[in-house]
């Protein structure tokens, strides 16, 4: 954090190196420079102490903490851990060299961790986490319920994104339940997330856009099941095994990404698969939920809770009989009910 004397010195040094005749740098100019420096200093040390500002203090981007948290808490998603953290680190480190926003599309069945990871990204990036004024979240049919209103939704998204980026270029936009949005809703957004995305003087290149969708969840499960039955370990699968499949499915299946110019223009940087949960992963989710209730999952009575939920509430896919259909999505309430 820059001290006021240092800030004032820096501003005055600019005057020194400017190719101006000495007599043209009058006391009023020097006074104006001092006032600017003083205003910036007091904004940083007074206003921004009590209100959220678009600065490093309020946007600490604690990606190392995110990495440790995902390693500790994210269950069954090795591909996500391998790619999300490096993608964020590279985008943030590129700073002024970045030529486009970071655009990521999460795909997978319900209960595989898409919202969980998006929430952790917001918490790591912003001091206020998902409550930050610089985090905007849209929710499927709740925000875009009518197919007939697509044209209006496009304008709504475009204007809202621009307004937010004017306030803070380092904003995060999360679009959840993309598969429940009408086709074409994102077409006007394409120009804002493309290369050299400066619109009306607004720098969009530092922003992050995350799209969450159940689209292709069944495709991921089918492909993973086939791969595993052919003798390959789940943990040996890579992003390249799924990314082409996700891009094709998102473009062709119903939802906000169907036939979208965002895919046609190749502005989505990463299509990330969230793999379906196996029984062992669901057990780990149940153990984590019990720990959240300050219960030891190894105790006999808590082991009984896990066993009862697994046997009575978990259904598996018909094709491979490997993957829990709802993943870990409904476990919170089931554990709470079992405890009380």
UniProtKB/Swiss-Prot annotation:
One of its GO terms (cellular component) is endoplasmic reticulum. SUPFAM superfamilies: P-loop containing nucleoside triphosphate hydrolases. It is found in: Endoplasmic reticulum lumen. ATP binds at residues 108-115. Changing residue 125 to L: In strain: ZBMEL82, ZBMEL95, ZBMEL131, ZBMEL145, ZBMEL157, ZBMEL229, ZBMEL377 and ZBMEL398. One of its GO terms (biological process) is eye pigment granule organization. Keywords: ATP-binding, Chaperone, Endoplasmic reticulum, Glycoprotein, Nucleotide-binding, Signal. Pfam families: Torsin. Residues 1-24 form the signal peptide. GO terms for molecular function: ATP binding; ATP hydrolysis activity. Changing residue 118 to S: In strain: ZBMEL82, ZBMEL95, ZBMEL131, ZBMEL145, ZBMEL157, ZBMEL229, ZBMEL377 and ZBMEL398. It comes from the Eukaryota. Changing residue 226 to N: In strain: MEL14, ZBMEL82, ZBMEL131, ZBMEL145, ZBMEL157, ZBMEL229, ZBMEL377, ZBMEL384 and ZBMEL398. Glycans are attached at residues 96, 311. InterPro entries: P-loop_NTPase, Torsin, Torsin_1/2. Belongs to the ClpA/ClpB family. Torsin subfamily. May serve as a molecular chaperone assisting in the proper folding of secreted and/or membrane proteins. This is Torsin-like protein. It comes from Drosophila melanogaster. The lineage of its organism: Eukaryota, Metazoa, Ecdysozoa, Arthropoda, Hexapoda. The gene is Torsin.
